[in-house]
Amino acid sequence: MNIAVVTDSTAYIPKEMREQHQIHMIPLQVVFREETYREEIELDWKSFYEEVKKHNELPTTSQPPIGELVALYEELGKSYDAVISIHLSSGISGTFSSAAAADSMVDNIDVYPFDSEISCLAQGFYALKAAELIKNGASSPEDIIKELEEMKKTVRAYFMVDDLAHLQRGGRLSSAQAFIGSLLKVKPILHFDNKVIVPFEKIRTRKKAISRIYELLDEDASKGLPMRAAVIHANREEEAAKIIEELSAKYPHVEFYNSYFGAVIGTHLGEGALGICWCFK
């Protein structure tokens, strides 16, 4: 059985890596001043942060139109028998639900939607795993889904924001909490819990927040088992590179990626956000 892998743009897997692993991508949409852009295709992360700075306003975001999902699946149906369609958490987007609905609209391929319950390159790790399983001979979509569900036990992601105002605008914090938090220089560490973004711990400074995320990574990385990990930044590429250099020296058994919060996720976290995600291979 020929099985395809699809993910959406919020996995932030670079184009070259998608092509290398034969991973197909459906973009979410970003609306800037009434202009609609397809994330990662018509708007990359660098252009997004430049636009936000230039106009001092944030875009709105939306899931892919269901017609685009149907069209992608039908096109894949010409070469494949089934598709594993991996998407950002259903708790923050309707993309997974749209993929499930699109399944009933296509006849030439079986669609297996998968809710990653997370986003960014942590979501991308599921797509990479699915592609590896297929390359290594997996021929049952059900078995691949089972492996991905098992993988949820080891996927971790923690991140911090530089400006609480973005969380407040998105309804994550009250205005009073954001104001007081800014005065106290609180840098909340966030994570996904039950499919939504929630505070994990409140830390007083950026430096201490990053140190705490290091500690959380060490709980798994110190076991010495092969792992994937990514340092994810919101327009802080050099800072992410320095962190990777430091962590790679400490954990040579971990494969590190320098990744980013693109337009859709960056809209909700704001420039300066930083996180680390990881999983066992």
Swiss-Prot record:
GO molecular function terms attached to this record: lipid binding
SUPFAM superfamilies: DAK1/DegV-like
KW Oxidoreductase (keyword) present: no
Positions bound to hexadecanoate: 61, 93
Keywords, in A-Z order: Lipid-binding
Changes seen on gene knockout: No growth phenotype, no effect on competence.
Residue ranges annotated for the DegV domain, each copy included: 3-280
Pfam families per the UniProt record, alphabetical: DegV
Function text: Binds long-chain fatty acids, such as palmitate, and may play a role in lipid transport or fatty acid metabolism.
PANTHER family: DEGV DOMAIN-CONTAINING PROTEIN DR_1986-RELATED (PTHR33434), FATTY ACID-BINDING PROTEIN TM_1468 (PTHR33434:SF2)
Assembly, per entry: Monomer.
Name of this chain's protein: Protein DegV
Source organism of this protein record: Bacillus subtilis (strain 168)
Originating gene: degV
